[in-house]
Regions:
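Juxta-kinase regulatory segment immediately upstream of eukaryotic protein kinase catalytic domains
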Residues: 2-41
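ATP/Mg2+ or Mg2+-diphosphate-binding catalytic cores
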Residues: 19, 192, 312-362
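A cross-family kinase active-site recognition segment
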Residues: 111, 140-200, 220-222, 328-331
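A conserved alpha-helical element in kinase catalytic cores
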Residues: 75-126, 143, 147-151
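Active-site acidic catalytic loop and adjacent metal/ATP-binding pocket
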Residues: 51-68, 72-73, 107, 210-260, ...
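Active-site activation/catalytic loop segments of kinase-like enzymes and analogous catalytic loops
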Residues: 258-292, 306-324
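Conserved short submotifs of the Hanks-type protein kinase catalytic core
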Residues: 125-138
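An alpha-helical support segment within catalytic cores of ATP-dependent transferases
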Residues: 24-37, 168-169, 184-227, 237-239, ...
């Protein structure tokens, strides 16, 4: 990626700078000290992977000599605005109050009752620390896929969105780089793609989005959304892999048209080896059964799915070029996203629109 293209991205999508902020790890010794000081806890500490936050698994001996007790400590990245971190915190508190049956992490208050602790790390940078429950389960990518699992994912997302609809927060409308409403702003990345076939494929999907979705998004039901309901953020029960046992990572939350959240999730459910449209229509129908959608929302789902896939291949490719040491992690969805985009582009949007309306009875 050339410097010129990078400058164009930051000009059109300035909030993307947080995605390229250098890693800001914190020493385990400091984390242990914070746990003792603020939560009165001690135990074995293991650093976990994370896109921006520094994450640590705390394992403590059980008082009753049973299974060890585990908690997750999240330390925010200094480049993340405090308001954004608080939005995520308030979402978890909101869900605990209004939808306690949903399998999301619970916040563990510090000794003074605070669920978020502000502190300066050894490097002098401000951080926010939050201690959460540790969700057990098998990461969905490691589990067998099935139609029942897809239906479970869609139904759970519908219930999550229904619960989040009443959440209000001043950071909900802040600009985020992963906002499908702004998919057209990655065009500079798409136009710079070296492969002419892939470039044309992505350009076509952006054109479809700009002509058939973008002008109509503003009239659709809008609310806080998870905005990253992909299989890497979901856990399943190993004994019943069709059942979702955990929802992770509220770090990309934003207020957006409700259908955007479904589009993000559906983009990761496209079956490239079978019926691509069928998997998306079944997914939409399962969501609709829990949280009814209107015809105007369904009419935009197909171009929105493709727009999300374009964003995945464009943004992750750009980030990998700027952060080659992190490329394997960043590009883990790249190849399959290209395949999904190609499968979707092969189906006329009018056919997809009719199939979605039929599947949902609209």
């Amino acid at each position: 990626v050339t410097t010129v293209i990078a400058d164009l991205v930051f000009d059109q999508l300035p909030e993307a700078a947080v995605l390229c902020a250098p890693a800001a790890p914190v020493p385990a010794e400091w984390v242990q000290a914070m746990l003792r000081m603020h939560w009165g806890l001690d135990g074995a500490l293991e650093a976990l992977s994370g896109e921006r936050d520094s994450n640590f698994l705390l394992t403590m001996a059980s008082i009753a000599a049973g299974a060890p007790v585990r908690r997750l400590l999240k330390v925010s990245h200094p480049a993340e605005p405090i308001a954004v971190t608080d939005f995520q915190t308030q979402a978890l508190l909101h869900l605990a109050r209004h939808a306690p049956e949903l399998p999301v992490q619970r916040l563990w208050p510090a000794r003074d009752g605070a669920v978020a602790v502000s502190a300066s790390a050894p490097d002098g940078q401000p951080r926010v620390l939050r201690l959460l429950s540790y969700l057990e389960g098998l990461p969905m990518p490691q589990a067998p896929r099935s139609a029942a699992q897809r239906a479970s994912v869609a139904g759970l997302l519908a219930r999550l969105d229904r619960a989040l609809a009443s959440l209000q927060h001043p950071a909900a409308n802040l600009a985020l780089p992963w906002d499908i409403q702004r998919a057209h702003q990655v065009r500079s990345l798409v136009d710079a793609m070296a492969d002419p076939v892939r470039r044309a494929l992505a350009q076509g999907a952006l054109q479809l989005f700009e002509s058939t979705a973008l002008p109509y998004l503003g009239a659709l039901p809008r609310q806080p959304t998870h905005n990253d309901f992909n299989i890497y953020n979901l856990l399943v029960d190993p004994a019943q892999p069709e059942q979702v046992s955990g929802i992770l990572d509220f770090g990309d939350m934003l207020a957006a048209p409700r259908i955007d959240d479904l589009a993000v999730a559906a983009a990761y459910q496209v079956d490239v080896d079978g019926d691509a449209l069928g998997t998306v229509t079944a997914f939409a129908a399962a969501f609709h059964a829990e949280t009814p959608l209107c015809a105007a929302e369904l009419d935009l789902l197909w171009p929105l799915v493709q727009a999300r896939l374009v964003m995945v291949v464009a943004i992750t490719g750009w980030r990998a070029a700027r952060q080659p040491h992190h490329a394997d992690y960043l590009l883990r969805n790249n190849a399959i996203s290209w395949a999904r985009l190609q499968a979707c582009a092969a189906i006329p949007s009018q056919q997809a629109r009719a199939a979605l309306r039929t599947a949902c009875g609209c």
